[in-house]
Amino acid sequence: MALFRGMWSVLKALGRTGVEMCAGCGGRIPSSISLVCIPKCFSSMGSYPKKPMSSYLRFSTEQLPKFKAKHPDAKLSELVRKIAALWRELPEAEKKVYEADFKAEWKAYKEAVSKYKEQLTPSQLMGMEKEARQRRLKKKALVKRRELILLGKPKRPRSAYNIYVSESFQEAKDDSAQGKLKLVNEAWKNLSPEEKQAYIQLAKDDRIRYDNEMKSWEEQMAEVGRSDLIRRSVKRSGDISEH
């Protein structure tokens, strides 16, 4: 199970390594930063039908133990790349077998979902739909965050308090993280104005660093046609050329 969970994480990190179809809808993944569409079933509603794996993921789970046995010292990321390469070279006739299995299971899944929903009360159905919306928003935010990391967006500036916490947290004498944070917070309150001023200055310096890095980064985004990532205030001021 741990190996399987590791494989999921590597697949998400690698992006489109041969995964052409979304496990949820069977369609191609349109993201500009290719991330594997990982299926998740509803959990809090009880026995909600579980989505079937896509043809590629089914193939991967079959091949992973074989590759692991052949290459026991290889990293999981290397094994996943080998499996992806094997999938790309797989004859279309063999791929169609996996795709046919997926389509059959997807049809059965949709029928099971319909039957499941018929048993729900209006309030339960509303709760399930609310949960689905929240999960979609969470996933959208996660994909956006990963995209910005891949594009090298500068880290936001830290406050004086955050700088102090990062410096003092490990030295705090408490076994729990919550206890450490409480001690650091109390120590911050007891700092003299002069002592706090040093951290305030560091925060100002970090803000200057952030502003300079963001200006450069947004210019790069404008050059590559990603003006959607430029802050609105910058667009209005005309500091960034979108051409």
Curated annotation (Swiss-Prot):
Phenotype of null mutants: Embryonic lethal, due to absence of mitochondrial DNA. Mutant embryos die before 10.5 dpc.
SUPFAM superfamilies: HMG-box
DNA-binding region (UniProt annotation): 49-117, 154-218
GO CC term (a single one): mitochondrial nucleoid
Pfam families reported for this sequence: HMG_box, HMG_box_2
Chain positions found as Phosphothreonine: 121
InterPro entries reported in the protein's UniProt record: HMG_box_dom, HMG_box_dom_sf, HMGB
N6-succinyllysine PTM positions: 66
PROSITE patterns per record: HMG_BOX_2 (PS50118)
Protein name (database record): Transcription factor A, mitochondrial
